[in-house]
Every structure is written in structure tokens, then in C-alpha cells.
Amino acid sequence: MAYLENRDPILGQRILKEYPDAVFRDDLMFFLAKDAVLRGKKEEAGRLLMELNPRNLKEEYREEYLNLWRELNLDPKAGFLKSPVLFRGFIQYIELSPEEALTASEELFRRRYYREVVALLEGLDFQKVCFMLGTSLRALRESEKALQTFQECRDSRARAELAVMYYELEQREKTEELLSSIVDRNLVSDILFRLGRLNVQRGNFQEAINFFLRMEPSYRRDFNLGLSYYALGDYAKAFEHFLASVKYSQTRDEASTGNFWAYKCAILLRREDASEYLVKASNGAGFYHAVASSMLGLPVASRALRVVMEDESLPKTAGVVKAIWEAGFPEYARLEAFKRLRDLTSSDVIAISRLDPHLAVRLAVRKYGYGSFVYNAVAFPRPFRGKVEKASEKYSIESALIYAVMRQESLFDPYAVSVANARGLMQLIDSTAQYVARREGIRIRNIYDPETNITLGAAYLRYLLDQWKGDLVRTLASYNAGPTRVRSWPQHEDQYLFIETIPIRETRDYVKRVMYNYYVYSELLR
């Protein structure tokens, strides 16, 4: 960017005027504001800060933008309305209309800033906000306040939360009273499912069965009935319900799951047709499709790699994106690619994948859809190959496993930052990164540096594998949820049963997705 070379404010203003839709507009306005402050022109700086959209700023500039806003004593409410997350520390100093408070609280709720949500909602129309308020209080472990909030809330979702809370407090009669008072059968099934899963996670499988049997017929009802009977050793009933789950399945993933578990039961029942269910599982999608395919010696990885549609032209947009990237502005390159989405060809997506695999996957999904030929062509790249192999050799971790975790954690985005403030390719939170760095004698200069992040992630995987004596499933669960939490769960010897009874859905899904990635990369890296 020419302005960055000489900091000429006249040039900067001319660029803003001539390129009103430029992807770097807000960043440029921020630089102009900083320079205006240095020149003593605080009014001009304030105008620029008020005009720009902080949501479009690069992550590294946002905290400085906030501090500059404070330094210039700009309107705290205006800042908060621009970005409730960034300006959440201003809540106590501002007055908002009910509509403004509700809109801001919804954004903060999605980002899990529950304390700020409570502060915003407590003065609003109770019945409009009671479910979000109660849920936030519960997340903050303020159980008594959450219970009282749900008791007074007329939102049907609150009744579901209340039924579960009563059950957890061992007030079973109140749970049953609520269930009998609800007319909506779908809501009743949702509550029964949650109560059943709660018992599955506690290892109370007979109690779980009692709840699942009261549900309306569905995939989740019969799959979890099958799971519970399987855990109790009643493989005949489990087999029956797993087959029923296939009947009610609505996705190829669900069908594979039901068929794989039916296969497990059929083996234990010594059925001659057991292998048929394994074959059916391999014809679906998802984690159990990968497991079944591997067991049958079939390929898991898609063979639609590097597919280019014959009727599409050579890449054009990719050239523009590459030029911006190579000029040192990867964030702007990504923004420019999405601006040009309509003109994007499959050739562009594949060309971009060599430069920025994260961007290529996102573009493929947005333009062509998940599972499309173009998506399959870029879905499992092998970037940072030398750095991955170096970490693999140093810590005796398969490259396939490092790639599998990296894909799920950041989708190969070196600049990724999660809601929990995990950073970089391997998504390490600060405390974990510092612990591993001290343990391994690694100096962290930049946590976003690909080599540093990959090395720390591989070292942490090695540490967890050693803790779990090579148990990959529990290692992955620990990478996501923490080893202390994983140790508190029922430790079923059957690895698949352990996965399906993980109490946290996010972790359960995480383990399956990383394992699926692992199967794919194990093939691609042979």
C-alpha cells in the first residue's frame, strides 16, 4: 500500500476517495486516524474513527483502535453499537434503548460473553429476554437465579431447561409435572432426549432407555436406544434399534452410523449377514463410513482431487488475489476473493488453494457447495509440508494426525482466533502454549507463526498421547476438552461406546471429525 511507505495524509485521503469500496478502506482510515493524532489533529482522527467499521479491521488493529477511541474520549455508546464485543467494557457507562440492548446482547450471547449479556438484559421486558437471560445465568453457574428465571419465563424453551434442571436437582416429580403439562409433542421429545442423554453420559443406561422409549419415533431415539441396550449387553435389542435408526435416518452420515453399530451387534450375535452392515456403512458418509471403509480395505479419500470443470475458463480472479497476497496483505486478499465470488471459477478456487488452502475451502463451499467436485478438489490440502514433517519427526507424531487436527482446529488458517481465544493453526490457548513451551524449551516469539504453532501443537499431542498410553481417541478428546475433564467421564473400554457417550456434543463431534480427517490423510500421505 503506497500510503504505508510515506504516511502522506493527502495521498491517503485520495486513495479513500478514488477507491470507496476497497477491501482495505477501514484499515487505511485507522492509519490515517493514528497519524492525525500524531499531528495534533484529534478532531480529524475522531471523525475517521467514528466513520470506519471496526468489524472490518484486521484483528491485530482492533485493540489499538479501542485504546485510541478511549484516548480521544469519543462517545462510548457509538463505539459499543459499532462492535458490542470489542466495546463490551463500556456497558456500565452507557444507556441503551431496549432494542439496542437486545440486539447487542444477541451478538454477545453468540460469542459467549454471558456476564455482559446478563448486565444488558436485566432491565428489559422480562418475557422477551427470559430464555437468553436464564441460559446465560446457567452458563455462569448461577443456578438459583437461572432456576427462578426459567420458572417465571413463558418461553417454551425455558420449560425444557426447567425440566432438565429439576431432574438434575433430583426433583423428578416436578420434571414429570412439566412433561405432562406440555402439549407440543416435539418439545416433549426434545426434553426426553436430553434426559436420556444425561443418563447415558452418567452410565445410567436403563434409566436412559426409560426416557428414550417415551419419545416420538426418530433416528436419534432409536440410535440412542440401541446404544443403551448395547452398553447393557442386550445385543439383540440393540441390533433391532440400530436397524430402526437406519430406517429413520435422514443423512448418509446417520445411515452409516446406524449400519456400523448394527454390524457391531451382528458380530456379537454371530449373525451370518454381519458383513452386509459393514458394507452398507462404508457406502455412506462421515466417521463411521471412514471406519467401515478402512476395515474393508476400501479407499476413504475422495478420488475427485484436482478436478477442473471442462466448461470453465482459466483462472483470472486467482491472479488478483495472488497479487494482493504476495504484496503482504493476506487478509485483503481474502476479502477481495469474496467480493469477486460471482466471477469465481473452479480453476480459480484450485489455483487459490496453492496459495491459501483455508480461503480455497471456504470459497468452494460458498460457491459450489459442501461435497461438490470443487470442494473435494481442495478439501484436504497438505500445506506447510516441511514444517509438519519436521514436527512429526521430532515428536514421533504421524503427519496425518497433525494435519487431521490442524484441519479441524483452524482449517489451515494461521491467523485463526476462536471464541475461547485459541490461536493459530493448531488453536492453542495461551496457558497451554506457555505450558508446552516451558516443558519443551521453546521460545514463543509469535504464536501465529506456522512453525511455532505446529511445533507446539505436535508437542502437546505427544504429551497427551503419553498421558493416555497411546489412546488416540482420549488424546483427541483431551486436546479439545482438556485431560482433567476427560478423566471424569465414564471410561468405557469399547472406544466407539466411549466416543458416543462423551457428555459434550462439541467434543464428541470433534473426535469424530478429526478421526475422519486422520483416515483421509493417512491415505493421502502414503
Place the predicted regions along the sequence by residue.
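Structural motif corresponding to the intra-repeat A-B loop/turn of tetratricopeptide repeats
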Residues: N6, R39, R111, L140, ...
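Catalytic glycan-binding domains that act on GlcNAc-containing polysaccharides
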Residues: E116, K145-Q148, L169-R172, E176-L198, ...
